Each structure stands twice: as structure tokens, then as C-alpha cells.
């Protein structure tokens, strides 16, 4: 996910775009992908050789077509040399798995739109984090997130304002409780969440460690 403001926040954290080696998209809505074009453009110009490690970017089926259509609009401005960019697609109809050098990625389809997938990333020493992306309540997330160290879960709206395709605090709490996760991190708050007790609503179902995400927050996994 890299929606609006991601690059600025990355720089504020002390990192640069060249410190990132992998980007995985849950789906292609603009609030999740709007800085993909600036990211690729900033990688290429003024000198693409500044990137010393190839960038891998992926998403559910349809990502390659999504990228091709962006190139149809921006042309070579967002094309990187083949040795600098790897693009991959994950199956968005069933579970998928990829092994990388020092971590693995497992995905599962979720209930938001056609290409939507959730991710479970597991380090070589066995610690894991699950990111739901945008989703409605889904048994596939419960399966994917079983006993994960951290579940980073969307929580768009308070319970009383639930809409299809998104989670509320109590629904997110239910997923976390049933998956027996070690820590729940709620994120993707719409402005309506500012006037609700998100933690209390989540506690209707989940009693474990709970964090409300904020910009520039850093999470240590496995400690």
C-alpha cells in the first residue's frame, strides 16, 4: 500500500525510496496506489542507477494490466530497466505463496473487490505479520492470520456506520480473537472514527494487545 503522502512519511522516518525492495498492493483503489507513479518516477529520474537493489512490486491478478494502463498515460516516464524492476501477480481466487530470499509471502482473497488480497509475510526466523487490506468480514482472513504475531487490520468506520466491503472495530476484533493473533493493529480510519471509541468497540470481541495505528509508528515484531 502506498497512498497519498507515503513518500513524505517515508522520508520523515529517515528512509528513502531506495531503502524499499518490495511493495505489495492489496488492491488498486487510489487511496492505496496513488503514489505508485511518483515512486517509479522518482526512482528513474534523474538517475535510475541510484537504485542498487531491484524493486519488486506485486498485487492480485490485474496488477500487470493496471501498470500497463498507467504506462499508456505516462509512457517511458514510469518504465524502469528490467534489471531494476520485477513485477508479479498473486492469485486472487485462492491462496497463493511465494518464497523470497529472506521471507515468504502468502496471500488469500478477501471480500472487497475482484483483485483484493490479504498478505501474510513470514520472516526467515518464523515471525509473521498479516495485512488485511480493505475487506469485509472474511473467514479467509481468520485462516490466513492464525496465530500471527501482528494483524494489521483495516477499520474504516465505527460499528454503527458499517458499510459493505469494510470492517468496523468489533468485526476486526472478532477476526483477531478467532485467529488468536498476538497483537491487533487497527488502521485505515475514516474521519468518522474520530468521534467514536474505537478501542472500546474492538474490545467487544478482542482482549489481547491492541494498537491504534498512526503515521510514523514503528512496530517491532517478535520481541
Language model regions located:
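Active-site neighborhood of phospho(di)ester-bond hydrolases with catalytic His/Asp-centered motifs
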Residues: 1-3, 21-27, 31, 60, ...
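Core dinuclear metal-dependent hydrolase active-site scaffold
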Residues: 1-16, 86-143, 215-223
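Active-site metal-binding motif and surrounding structural segment of the metallo-beta-lactamase
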Residues: 4-56
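Hydrophobic packing residues within well-ordered alpha-helices of enzyme cores
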Residues: 10, 36-39, 67-70, 141, ...
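Structured loop/turn residues at beta-strand edges in well-structured enzyme cores
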Residues: 15-18, 53, 83, 101-103, ...
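P-loop/Walker A phosphate-binding loop and immediately adjacent motor/lid segment at beta-alpha junctions
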Residues: 39-56, 111-117, 122-123, 164-185, ...
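Acidic/polar short surface loop at catalytic or gating sites that assists cofactor/ion binding
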Residues: 45-90
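Cap/insert and terminal regions of metallo-dependent hydrolase folds
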Residues: 136-223
